[in-house]
UniProtKB/Swiss-Prot annotation:
This is NADH-ubiquinone oxidoreductase chain 4L. Gene3D superfamilies: 1.10.287.3510. Its EC number is 7.1.1.2. It catalyses: a ubiquinone + NADH + 5 H(+)(in) = a ubiquinol + NAD(+) + 4 H(+)(out). InterPro entries: NADH_UbQ_OxRdtase_chain4L/K (IPR001133), NUOK/Mnh_C1-like (IPR039428). Core subunit of respiratory chain NADH dehydrogenase (Complex I) which is composed of 45 different subunits. Core subunit of the mitochondrial membrane respiratory chain NADH dehydrogenase (Complex I) which catalyzes electron transfer from NADH through the respiratory chain, using ubiquinone as an electron acceptor. Part of the enzyme membrane arm which is embedded in the lipid bilayer and involved in proton translocation. It comes from Macaca hecki (Heck's macaque).
Length: 98
């Protein structure tokens, strides 16, 4: 396997482990999720540049759109939780409460 792909897969794995380890704080979870999305974007860009299939070139752009939407929703949720509770703990997030 090419070392570039291995480094990107290692970055994704480290971000995934960080997501599983630091799941009590929303800021840490959002940063790890953003790291996972960026490593997926780099991997998709490398795959799109190495293959000569023209329809796959749009895949990294679509992935960036989803990453931007995920970041916007995550930051809005962070602001809402920090204004309501004053903390960024995920266990404060309960959607069943009114």
């Amino acid at each position: 396997m090419i070392p570039t792909y291995m480094n990107i897969m290692l970055a994704f794995t480290i971000s995934l482990l960080g997501m599983l380890t630091y799941r009590s704080h929303l800021v840490a979870s959002l940063l790890c999720l953003e790291g996972m999305m960026m490593s997926l974007f780099i991997m998709a860009t490398l795959i799109a540049s190495n293959t000569h299939f023209p329809l796959i070139n749009i895949m990294p752009i679509i992935l960036l759109v989803f990453a931007a939407c995920e970041a916007a929703v995550g930051l809005a949720l962070l602001i809402s939780i920090s204004n309501t509770y004053g903390l960024d703990y995920i266990h404060n997030l309960n959607l069943l409460q009114c």
